[in-house]
Curated annotation (Swiss-Prot):
One of its GO terms (cellular component) is cell outer membrane. The lineage of its organism: Bacteria, Pseudomonadati, Spirochaetota, Spirochaetia, Spirochaetales. InterPro entries: Lipoprotein_OspC, OspC-like_sf. Belongs to the variable small protein (Vsp) family. A lipid is attached at residue 19 (S-diacylglycerol cysteine). It comes from the Bacteria. It is a lipid-anchor. This is Variable small protein 1. It holds the Pfam family Lipoprotein_6. Keywords: Cell outer membrane, Lipoprotein, Membrane, Palmitate, Plasmid, Signal. Genes for both Vlp and Vsp families are on (usually) unnamed linear plasmids in B.hermsii HS1. The keyword Oxidoreductase does not apply. The Vlp and Vsp proteins are antigenically distinct proteins, only one vlp or vsp gene is transcriptionally active at any one time. Switching between these genes is a mechanism of host immune response evasion.
């Protein structure tokens, strides 16, 4: 995100340098391109800042969703004295509780994003879809508490809840896959909004072709 902000600052500088101040009198936050197009730098900069901040928040959610895969890698394992893993079958209750806590955090962050004012219709739809998928995942884990909410939760049940590559997906994986798809789409849309805001600055000047008539 720091690299993106640096690039935005550089873009603003280049736009300012490439614009002229001829023509009508401009306000302090405005510049004019060579074709006469007036850019409100304050407005465009604010739009870029808002889009970038929103995309950063979505990236946090995306990272949390992907972290469930990392947790799934610890199913049926314990740490050895040499730092490696050893088998510990049928003791996955705490791991599943941790995954459920992550799911609740995902829901909380998506609820905040869903309440943001001024979202485009596309972003609003993507946030709502991700929020719905997140709630479906956490609700599924809660519904399966008989098998998942105990210290002796089996490896098979834990994998059916958290491991997306598992053949059996009836304790949460189906919902987790849908959440992954939804949050991927949300991140893509959020990054697209940033790019669209930047393009307002970098759109090329339209040059009229000279007349072919003598």
């Amino acid at each position: 995100m720091r690299k993106r902000i640096s690039a935005i600052i550089m873009t603003l500088f280049m736009v300012f340098m490439s614009c002229n101040n001829g023509g009508p009198e401009l306000k302090s936050d405005e510049v004019a391109k060579s074709d006469g197009t007036v850019l409100d730098l304050a407005k465009i900069s604010a739009k870029i800042k808002e889009a970038s901040a929103f995309a950063a928040s979505v990236k946090e959610v995306h990272t949390l969703v992907k972290s469930v895969d990392t947790l799934a890698g610890a199913i049926g394992k314990k740490i050895k004295s040499d730092g490696k893993f050893d088998a510990m079958a049928g003791k996955n209750g705490s791991l599943l509780a941790g995954a459920y806590n992550v799911a609740l955090d995902i829901n909380s962050k998506l609820t905040v994003l869903d309440g943001k004012a001024g979202l485009s219709s596309l972003l609003k739809a993507k946030v709502t879809a991700a929020k719905t998928s997140g709630e479906s995942f956490s609700n599924k884990l809660k519904t399966e508490h008989t098998d998942l909410g105990k210290e002796e939760a089996s490896d098979d049940n834990a994998k059916a809840a958290l491991l997306v590559t598992n053949a059996t997906k009836n304790k949460g994986v189906t919902e987790l896959e849908a959440l992954n798809t939804a949050v991927d789409a949300l991140l893509k849309a959020a990054e697209g909004e940033v790019e669209a805001a930047i393009k307002e600055l970098t759109a090329p000047v339209k040059v009229e072709k000279p007349s072919q008539n003598n």
